[in-house]
């Protein structure tokens, strides 16, 4: 019975992963992610029902589009598998007894699934385009508010702590919209700050601090490796160019998931 439950959760996670790849591709292009059918990005042919099974479709089709025979990037398969494994890992770590499932545990798991969706989409878009998209941040704050309401009503949590987070979120959002919208660098930093607030709401201060620490270490290693690469290849890449290649949102997402696990 347990094996069947874990397989089902893995498949649900893989389906989420399939949706994440769609969202990562469409959100920066301002395309609809809910009503428009999936299509091949190479030939634009709409995909059939049997073309969209997570993992299986990729394997059966040999990593190619059924219609134009162009290769499909392996990131689709990788993200679906990773998503499935992470969903299973979270279920296992929460120690949910499948023979005595409690509503509170199911609610917590659902909130965690929504939160992981936020991280995956942020990471995917940032890795591809180095952007923290506002629609994704808006989604993050919406699920945060719902989660706060749940904690305060059901678990009688201290609401003042979360109110402080929301106040900071609104202040940064106002600054980003009014004062700093002309500066791409500041806009990106503000997006990172808003992302950190959502992380803190869902995972608490301790995990957030560890996430920031591990991300800082990762960024430092990245910069050091780039400097060494510059010296070896005698590259003229400036610090400004290194900054432009630095995907902090991606690193934050990855380190936060690893810290949770």
Residue ranges and their predicted role:
Residues 1-261:
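A membrane-topology feature that recognizes alpha-helical transmembrane segments
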């Amino acid at each position: 019975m347990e094996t069947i439950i874990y397989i089902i959760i893995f498949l649900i996670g893989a389906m989420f992963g399939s949706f994440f790849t769609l969202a990562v591709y469409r959100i920066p292009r301002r395309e609809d992610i809910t009503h428009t059918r999936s299509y091949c990005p190479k030939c634009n042919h709409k995909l059939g029902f049997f073309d969209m099974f997570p993992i299986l479709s990729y394997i059966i089709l040999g990593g190619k589009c059924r219609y134009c025979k162009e290769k499909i990037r392996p990131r689709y398969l990788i993200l679906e598998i990773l998503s499935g494994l992470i969903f299973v890992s979270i279920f296992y770590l929460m120690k949910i007894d499948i023979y005595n499932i409690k509503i509170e545990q199911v609610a917590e798991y659902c909130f965690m699934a929504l939160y992981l969706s936020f991280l995956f989409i942020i990471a995917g878009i940032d890795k591809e385009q180095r952007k923290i998209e506002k629609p994704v941040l808006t989604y993050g704050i919406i699920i945060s508010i719902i989660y706060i309401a749940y904690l305060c009503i059901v678990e009688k949590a201290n609401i003042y702590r979360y109110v402080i987070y929301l106040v900071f979120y609104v202040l940064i959002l106002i600054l980003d919209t009014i004062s700093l919208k002309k500066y791409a660098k500041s806009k990106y930093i503000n997006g990172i700050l808003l992302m950190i607030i959502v992380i803190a709401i869902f995972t608490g201060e301790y995990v957030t601090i560890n996430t920031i620490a591990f991300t800082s270490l990762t960024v430092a290693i990245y910069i050091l490796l780039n400097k060494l690469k510059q010296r070896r290849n005698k590259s003229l890449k400036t610090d400004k160019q290194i900054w432009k290649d630095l995907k902090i949102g991606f690193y934050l997402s990855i380190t936060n998931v690893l810290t949770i696990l």
